[in-house]
Amino acid sequence: DENKVFVAALGHPYGPNEERGVYRSINGGKNWEKILFIDENTGAVQVTIDPNNSNIIFADLWAGRQGPWENGAWNGKESGLFKSTDGGNTWKKMTKGLPTTEQGLGRIGFCIAPTDSKRMYATVDAGREGGIFRSDDAGESWTRIQTDNRYWGRASDFAEVKVDPKNADIVYSA
């Protein structure tokens, strides 16, 4: 449906603001409704629709705060990956196999394999517990497959991971 549009809004990074979250339009952007909001400190960084089922939507919410001279806070208790199976009406936080906020969970970048929607990859910023993770059950559970921080070490800045459009076993990170 080309009239259905989703937007991830991080909000400004210098303090709390109510504009953060995931928004949806069902009329091509004429009107918007906020469909996922955690709090005024947690913004949405990414929203992705399953390429094979438009009712399944994932969103990365990140509680990050920029301070003066780069002394911000880059993780917060509400950071995480969220999944909706009903077009964005309800959301569930995906936690199985992912680092916790107590372990330093920050920003997540993720992708869905176009050839197999059950296969997902994510770069997870979480200090020693971070890395590149893989899910084989559409985000319900995750396994860390790479710990070398050269592949994911600036996840709070970039958090990019992509899967090859023809081969779900090939993944790229930046």
What spans do the regions from the language model cover?
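Beta-propeller blade termini and top-face loops
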Residues: 1-174
